[in-house]
């Protein structure tokens, strides 16, 4: 049971770190290549 509570307390921290890293990566990518994220359908 101790492992479960430890996992439940660290999972939100890991998810927030991963989301922050992904958002930062997308922001930097969009800053250098602003037209590559949105591909036109045509």
Curated annotation (Swiss-Prot):
Keywords, A to Z, come to: Membrane, Photosynthesis, Photosystem I, Thylakoid, Transmembrane, Transmembrane helix
Q: Which residues form a coiled coil?
A: none
Organism superkingdom: Bacteria
InterPro entries the UniProt entry points to: PSI_PsaJ, PSI_PsaJ_sf
Q: Membrane-spanning residues where?
A: 7-27
Q: What Gene3D superfamilies does the record tag this protein with?
A: Single helix bin
Where does it primarily localize?
membrane
- Any GO BP: photosynthesis
* Gene Ontology annotations for the cellular component aspect, listed alphabetically: photosystem I; plasma membrane-derived thylakoid membrane
> Which membrane topology describes this protein?
Single-pass membrane protein
The record's subcellular locations are:
Cellular thylakoid membrane
Q: What family does the database annotate?
A: Belongs to the PsaJ family.
Task: Report the function annotation for this chain.
Answer: May help in the organization of the PsaE and PsaF subunits.
Q: What is this protein's record name?
A: Photosystem I reaction center subunit IX
């Amino acid at each position: 049971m101790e492992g479960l509570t430890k996992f439940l307390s660290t999972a939100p921290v890991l998810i927030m770190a991963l989301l922050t890293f992904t958002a930062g990566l997308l922001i930097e990518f969009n800053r250098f290549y602003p037209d590559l994220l949105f591909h036109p359908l045509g």
